[in-house]
Every structure is written in C-alpha cells, then in structure tokens.
Amino acid sequence: MDTSNAAGNSSNDQIEVFFDGLCQPYNPGGIACYAFIIKKQQEDPQTIHSEYGLAAEPFTDYATNNVAEYTGIIKALEWLLLQQTSELNNNHTATESIIIKGDSQLVIYQIKGRYKVKAIKIIPLYQKVMSLISKFNDIHFEWIPREKNSEADKLTNYAYTKIIDSDPTLRKKIGQHMATEQQLEFLKNLGISPEKYLSKIEAKRLISKIKKYRHNI
C-alpha cells in the first residue's frame, strides 16, 4: 500500500478515480450526495465505470459534505476491489496502479496522514477507507483543484437533482433555501446556467467568486 502522490507515474496500466461529495442546500444537515468516476489511463482515457447516490439520510446530523466525500471514496474502492477479486479468480494478475483524485484537501490529507481525523462521525469512514486501501498493492491519493474535478462535480450535482426530482417532500423542504430570483438573474445575465436546485449559499459563493475575478482583471 502506498498513499503518496503518483506524480511521474506514466504507466499505461494506471487507473484514475475522481470522486466528489456535496451537501446541499446547507451543510451540515442537508442532502448529502456522492459520485465517482473511474478511468483507464491511456492515450485516450476511457471511463470504465461511474456511480452516484445518497451518502446519508437527508436532513440528519450525519448528512455532511465530508461524509459524502468519504462515501465516494469507499464506494469507488469497493468497486475496484470487486474487479480485482474477479481478475484474480480468473487467473489474471491485478497489476494496475491506482490513483485517487479529489478536490477536498481535508479528506485527501487525512488519508495521507497529514491531518488528524477529529470528527466522531468521520472516524469509522476513515477506518473503512484505510482498511480498503490496505488490500491494494499500488494505490495513491492526490489532491486536485476543483476545476480539475469537474466531471465528478457534475455527477454529484446530477445525483442531487435526481434525488430531489424523485421526492416531492424533499422539494418542499428545500424550497426556502433555494437561490433568490435576484441571484439567478445575476448569474443568467453573465451567461451562466444555474443548477436546477441551486441554493442561496452556493449562489452567493458563485457570485462572490465572479465579482472577485472581475475585480482582478
């Protein structure tokens, strides 16, 4: 097991995993969703599997962004372990180097041992991750900026939208937390198409980021 960065590893057998998690319309205690995408690293990288879902019971203390991030890693590792077991059972050698990439610096650095895990609800998830990665021979973790994790980010937002679409009770409960007409109009005037269930908090973050960017140019 190796949880260091895999920088410089150009092996054609490398597997890349991009994971993400969110908790909206507020964190903690909102609707926590996870997603992950697994790619085979080659000249033209191919997605070999992707998955998304609910990370915790909505509107509970357990529903947090970090729970969702950890759930994404756990689900990805469980899928990879299943594939590895299948290969070994078919007398194939599981030789791929695996690199797990995410934009949560906290989660990545906890797994790499740079940060301590202090939150009670995260400890069992962290222990589960460490147990799973011990089953792989060549596995690495790398923090990436949010803009380089756009596919996984879009998939978590898709999961969030799909879950709310399927449950009228959830739609009713989040109503007061949705972005205001003024916020939506501001974003649309900039050519930005807001997510279907964009929260006030997320809209405020986006607008602040845009204003800061425009001020600096």
Task: Give the positions of each predicted feature.
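Glycine- and charge-rich intrinsically disordered segments
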Residues: M1-S11, E87-N91, K162-D165
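RNase H-like nuclease fold core
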Residues: D2-V67, T71, E78-W79
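RNase H catalytic domain
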Residues: L22-Y26, I74-T161
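Exposed beta-strand and adjacent loop surfaces of beta-rich binding modules
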Residues: C33, S97, L184
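A short glycine-/small-residue-rich loop at the edge of a beta-strand within enzyme catalytic domains
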Residues: A63, V67, I120, W143, ...
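Interfaces that engage single-stranded nucleic acids at replication/repair/recombination sites
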Residues: K162, S166-I217
